[in-house]
Amino acid sequence: MIDVNNFESMEIGLASPMKIRSWSYGEVTKPETINYRTLKPEKDGLFDERIFGPTKDFECACGRYKRARYNKRVCERCGVEVTSAKVRRERMGHIELAAPASHIWYFKGIPSRMGLVLDMSPRELEEVIYFASYVVLDAGDTGLEKKQLLSEPRYRELKEEYGNRFTAEMGAEAIQKLLADVDLAKEATELKAVLKEATGQKRTRAVRRLDILEAFLKSGNKPEWMVMDVIPVMPPDLRPMVQLEGGRFATSDLNDLYRRVINRNNRLKRLLELNAPGIIVQNEKRMLQEAVDALIDNGRRGRPVAGPGNRPLKSLSHLLKGKQGRFRQNLLGKRVDYSGRSVIDVGPSMKMNQMGLPVPMAMELFKPFIIHELTKRNLATNVKAAKRMIDKRDEKVFDVLEDVIKEHPVLLNRAPTLHRLGIQAFEPILVSGKAMRLHPLVCAAYNADFDGDQMAIHVPLSDEAQAEARLLMLAAHHILSPRDGEPIVAPSQDMVIGNYYMTTEDKAREGEGMIFKDTNEARMAYRNGYVALQTRVGVLTSSFDKKPFTAEQRQKIMVTSVGKLLFNNIMPEDYTYINEPTADNLQNGVPDKYFLEPGEDIHAYLENAPLVPPFKKGFLSDIIADVYKIYKVTVTSQLLDRIKDLGYYESTISGLTVGIADVTDLKEKPEIIEKAHKQVALVTKQFRRGLITDNERYERVIGIWNDAKDEVQNKLIEHMDIHNPINMMSDSGARGNISNFTQLAGMRGLMASPSGKIMELPILSNFREGLSVLEMFISSHGARKGMTDTALKTANSGYLTRRLVDVAQDVIVREKDCGTDRGLEVTAITNGNEMIEPLYDRILGRYTMKSVFNPETGEKIVGKNVLLNEEMAQKIIDAGVQKVTIRSAFTCNTEHGVCERCYGRNAATGDQVEAGEAIGTVAAQSIGEPGTQLTLRNFHTGGVAGNDDITQGLPRIQEIVESRNPKGKATISEVTGQVVSIEENPAEQTKDVTIKGETDTRTYTLPITARIRVAEGDDIHRGRAINEGSIDPKEMIRVRDVLSTETYLLSEVQNVYRMQGIDLLDKHVEIMIRQMMRKVRVMDPGDTDVLPGELLDISQFRDANYQTLISGGIPATARPVILGITKAALETNSFLSAASFQETTRVLTDAAIRGKNDPLVGLKENVIIGKIIPAGTGMGAYRNIKPKEVSVNTGATDGAITSIREMEEQLKDQD
């Protein structure tokens, strides 16, 4: 076997007949498979042991030689080589065809490759190949033309007239001869000459032909190889035949297809020997051609060959295609050993880096480790005895199991794996039962809940795999989401309500105004019932020796609540005391207003002091983010566990319950509804009198009922008791929101009909009163629509993610600094007056390209090439800076990736990104993962004329990344100048906008409903939209430059996500857009070898020009193109990646003719061939590291190494 990790690249080409014969171990001449009585393979048949190898390990067919000692011996009696039966998976055979057959991929594909080489149309080719017409091979002196088609009667006439002065033939044989006659170099030269004059259709055809001819010239493939004299036969174990119970056989479809080819081939041979009449031979040749076509790609031409039950047979092409094909099913998605799956259950008592593993699963997963340990400890004499012990569940085994799983991390995965946090590592803890236990805080990352979800578990085997799982994948490390750098692990549900209840303050609770010397004294008073958690008390500030209070504050008494004292007790010792849920408290410590001078009357203070709001879910997240920033991973994960334990404990003790009595009645509801009814009656009256249109009436009625619902909601909030458990639940962010409460206690309001239009009939009841039958029926429409939408959205979003990953999978951080001198000037993204993305979010975690100066004073805030952290970014914003030039993926010069500087900070760790990080995949997942939260529908903008439905949500994202013509397209100005006139033309229902540029004047005609964005006298830049709507990026890239198009697309994507409240970092979107813009189309090839109209990577284009300029030639010119992600993924330099994505046969056909070489740069192609991926520790720099013993010093840092870089630093120090 070849070692996959040792080769550089992989090449594909056309197989010559000699090559096919060299692969083969013998010719298959009989259609037989296996003998039905003996079940042994037939001689010379499709399963022959002489050709393909023995069916039993080291045993020949007749049984003369058995055992491995006869290895490689060929039996004299039966001719079978004695070797491992595995060879039946790799040995091929061949079939010598009695007449050549064309390969359907090259004849039928679009464009037809044979047609382009011969300059014949696919229709003409089909007539020749399938024996409908003759083609002239040699015209002699007859005045016919070469390649001219002749019908059967016409051929006979000419034959009588000219005899043997010309030759014409039919079938693939004729095409093979024509292909062999083509002088590639001569044709290519002629075409190049044609290209200089030709235009239009003729030019396009010439370019395509030249492209194919050049491909044959460069690759060394010969055109005649597109017609086959011999076809390979696949190894038998890859097209098996198995016996079912009842004596029937199940067989792979390929065997049927091969059998048809062999049968027809043998019949043709016999007919040729018998000198049968031409028409019979011709018919048999045509049938052989059709059999070969069906074998290669059944159904591509004519009706597919069907098997039993009229099911089309699966041919060789079908084995590769689609989700169930070889690429996606077996090469990209293998099933692995040492894995299992089970239902998950909650494990609230575990630490963040642990999971509960059921004993029976652990026994099976760690079996080899247990066996090894049992024999090592001499508890079992050999492997067999050890296995027996495990099967009998011997109690010694359990002790060994405990030791084996200690310190051995396992990986847990939940499908669908939408982002990289869908697989995390944990340390297993043995638990009883059959369900795996999952830590409650990692549920958010997995999107898991415990209503029957299942998860898969995998055991990393090698030491390196275990080390990576522990250092890089441990769940405790994954605190920030790679999408936006915010914490993804946050307390939820019970934990939130527990901490909320605990940090609530109440007036006049028992023991109010007591003053304690420290937290412990307060805890004792609480345990003994002198105070409640919600009691406001004083405590000596000086008792907190490590908390960062000011010297002044340390002399005073701080007013807080007992619950808050206990809450702060679980925080890191030197972390700020948290007394109110504000960012100010986190950044600058407890405000001075909470401190009393010793001797001041605390009761008087409490009389007037307002109650401080409790800590809600969002604030707990802020605390976690802040702690992470200061203390990094270890401390944060420990804190998270403490918050979790405290939350569960306190929510249990609080005794919060929900009953029907907690849903209060609203006294004002009847009069609000009465008022609304009157307004509706008034509007209807106006409509009947013809004062308003039906549309206006509808809009107003909807408006009236929405206002009524809002009023009910506001009244409910006013009357809401802060101790109401339902209110506490929604206010804390544990579950539900105010609209749920409105539906329980107020009114349900308006519902959507099945068409999505809002019905005028409101649901006046709430769930507390109960709905009438009609109301119930109406509201069921909306519920059903919600369910179907979600299902559709999931599929759409999943497919989007797949395309995004495919186009960006080869983008990896390749180097430290690409040395670019270009940057991206960023400002806040706004839409009208609405802030979409503030400048702070756009510059945080990025490198500056130029120094940033204070616009008022002119002083330098930060220099160039500086990574902006929170503090610096805030400084820039505070100084009133509007524009900052940053390093960006758009302007990065690194090939096949991005450099560390242009990428900036890794959102998932909060540190500078490291070389080897697979940022392309992370970017794709970050954009795709929230896809299910985006809406599927277009928003109907309340009937405002002209502003037709703006595409939003998922459809808009697809429109952008596939660079389709947008719905509601805006017209853009092609000149820079001034708007001189805007004229309406009512007769033709249009508006004409005239813009006077520096050189010419343009007039744009828009529909009369269009909302114009400019006014007369306005200055306008080229590429700016004249009316409301989305700009077509293809037009923009034509009129403006690449960078402004990229910037526009970035702001459009952000617009969609931020409108839905989803934060997404710019850098992810930048990477995707850069992948769409990486190609240029050659306009004029100059003196280079490239072809006009060819798509090239920018780097390839630059290299071609560089060589030409050095030798003093004229360089080529090209213009940038924008490709949709599907097209971009198919245009990648890796044919393996493209073929495994979509249109497998087309990609492979093209790659074979061009003799493409796959450099194995991306992740996908390396996974396909089983090579370690060139990202992370698989990068060249990290390979071939020799292990070295190091003394472990325990008193070092907090012990947790969080990145490879830290590991390297430590090793350096020890050297």
Swiss-Prot record:
Coiled-coil region(s): none
Sites where the protein binds Zn(2+) 2: C818, C892, C899, C902
GO annotation (BP), single: DNA-templated transcription
A Gene Ontology term for the protein's cellular component: DNA-directed RNA polymerase complex
CDD domains assigned: RNAP_beta'_C, RNAP_beta'_N
Residues noted as binding Zn(2+) 1 in the record, renumbered to the chain: C60, C62, C75, C78
Subunit comment: The RNAP catalytic core consists of 2 alpha, 1 beta, 1 beta' and 1 omega subunit. When a sigma factor is associated with the core the holoenzyme is formed, which can initiate transcription.
Free-text function comment from the UniProt entry: DNA-dependent RNA polymerase catalyzes the transcription of DNA into RNA using the four ribonucleoside triphosphates as substrates.
Name the record gives this protein: DNA-directed RNA polymerase subunit beta'
Gene responsible for this protein: rpoC
